[in-house]
C-alpha cells in the first residue's frame, strides 16, 4: 500500500480537494472553499496546511464565527445543497459561536462542514487557554455542545481516525434526507501530528446524489387516496426546489386542477404568477392560500417538514375528513400528521403520480373557488401597497397596541412610511432576477405574504431556525453563489444589531450586497406577540430607561444605522419618503461596493393574521384580565387543532 506522510490538517485539506458530487449526470467540485477565523486552536495546524497547499480551496476571512458559518449555509442553500463551504474556528468561544449556525443548518437540512479547533488530545498543558474543565469528565470540551445541533459529530483524537470520520462526514453532507451540520472537532495537537496516510484516501471521490424512486405500492396508495378527494391542496416545500421539480409541479397542478400554497423554503420554486400558485400558506400565509386550505379535504405536502407555521399549529386544515399525503425523501418527515407517505424524490414522485392519475381521468372538484380566493388576495395586496399614514384617523394593520404613540414615532423618525407600502415599492423597483434574503422578525411574514417572485429561486428565507443575524451574512453567501445577481438583505433593526459583521467581509471580497434595513424602533414582531396576548409593551421597544418608573419606557433611542455602516466603507442612504427610497434603490444598483439603505418605518404597519392561528404558551394564571382572556382564547383554538 502506497502512503504519503502528512499532518492530520494537511491530509484533511488534501481530502476535501478531491470531493465531487454528481446530480443528474452533472459532476462538480463539492467543497468550494473554507471560511476561517484563526486562533491558537487552529492557526498552526489547519492554518499551516491551508497556507502551504490549499489546492483549489478558496480561503475566506470571516469576522464572526456565527456570521461566516451562516454565509456558508446560505451559499449551500442557494446552490441547492450541491456545493458547500467549510468553516474553521479556534477553541472555546470561537467554536461556541458556531453552535447557533450549526443549529440553523440542521434545522433547515442544509449541509455545512464545521471544523472547530479543540483542546489537546494529550491533555499535557491542561487547562489550555479557553478550555472548560469538567471535573466529572475530562473528555468533554466546548465542542460537545455541537452534538445536539449536528447531524454528524466526531472528534479526531488520533490522525488515523480522520479517514473513517471524513467518509462518514461526506455521507451526511451529500444525503438529501439527512443532511445538516457536520462537526469534526480537531484537537490542536492532533492537527499537527504526522501519519502515513494511504494514497487511496486521497483519490477523487464522486458522491452521487441519487433521486429516490417511489415504490409502486406507495404510488398506488396515493392515487387511491387522491381519487376519493374533491378539494386537494398542495404544499410546495423546499424539497421542490432542491429536487428541481418546479415544472413537474406546475404540470401536475394544471392537469388535475389542484392549487398549491408555498412554505418559506418553497417560495419562488415556481414564479408567483402561475395560475395555481396561491402564495404563502400558514401562520405567515396570505388570504388566498389559507382560505383554500381551510376547506381542503386532502393536503399533499411535497418536500415540507410541516412546521407549526405551515400547519397553523395543526389547526389550519378544518375539513372534517381532511387527510394527508406526503412526498418526501425523509421518512421522518413523511410520517408526520399520520400521512399516507411516498418516500421518494419530489420530481420522480410527481411524474409517477401524474401518469397514474391521467389513467383514471382525475380532476379536482373545484369550480371557481381558486379564482375567487386569488382575486380576494390581489385586492388585499393592492390595499397593502397603498397604506399611507396620516395623523388623524389612521388605523394601523396591527391595531389596538401602540396607536397612541404612532405620532411620537412619526415625529421621531421624521417619516410616515408604512412597512407594507415600502415592501410593495421595493418589489416593484428592484430587478426581477434580484434575490432577497430574510430570516427573522416581522419581515418574513410580510415577505411570504406580499412578495411577488417573478423569477425562480429569487426568494431566500431562513425560517427553519429563524435566526436573527442571518440576513446580512446570508446575503454574502448568496452573492458568492450568484455573483452576477443583485442581492438584497431584508433586515430589521433588531436583527441588524444582533449581527452584521460580515458586511466587512463583503467589502474585503468585493462581493457587493445591498442591505435594506427596516428601522421601526424595536423588536416589533415580539411586541405584536406580547400585546396580542394581553401584555403591555414590555422591553421590546428601543427606549431609554425611565428614572421615574425604573422601566424601559422612556424616550426612543436614536440610532443612525447609515452612519454605522458607513464606517465600514459601505455606501449608505437615509430614507424617509418613497421618493427617497426609489432614488436610493436606483443609485445602489450602480454601486460596486456594498450598500445600506436605512428605511424608517412606523411600527404596527406590517401585515397581520389571515385566517390562521399560532399556538404559543400563555400564562394560565395572571392578575391581568387581558392575559386571562388570551389564555381562554388559546384553549378554545386548541380544541380545533389536531392532537398529533
Swiss-Prot record:
Q: Which residues bind thiamine diphosphate per the record? A: 65
- SUPFAM superfamilies in the record: DHS-like NAD/FAD-binding domain (SSF52467), Thiamin diphosphate-binding fold (THDP-binding) (SSF52518)
**Record-stated family:** Belongs to the TPP enzyme family.
Return the cofactor note field.
Answer: Binds 1 Mg(2+) ion per subunit. Binds 1 thiamine pyrophosphate per subunit.
User: Out of the domains of life, which is the source?
Assistant: Bacteria
Q: Output the PROSITE patterns linked to this UniProt entry.
A: TPP_ENZYMES
Query: Record keywords: Hydrolase included?
Result: yes
Q: Name one GO molecular function term.
A: magnesium ion binding
Question: Which species is this record about?
Answer: Geobacillus kaustophilus (strain HTA426)
Q: What is this protein called?
A: 3D-(3,5/4)-trihydroxycyclohexane-1,2-dione hydrolase
Binding site residues for Mg(2+): 493, 520
| Biological-process GO terms, alphabetical | inositol catabolic process; isoleucine biosynthetic process; L-valine biosynthetic process
Function in brief:
Involved in the cleavage of the C1-C2 bond of 3D-(3,5/4)-trihydroxycyclohexane-1,2-dione (THcHDO) to yield 5-deoxy-glucuronate (5DG).
Q: Which GO terms describe its cellular component?
A: acetolactate synthase complex
As its record notes, the protein acts as a catalyst of: 3D-3,5/4-trihydroxycyclohexane-1,2-dione + H2O = 5-deoxy-D-glucuronate + H(+)
Its keywords, alphabetically, are: Hydrolase, Magnesium, Metal-binding, NAD, Thiamine pyrophosphate
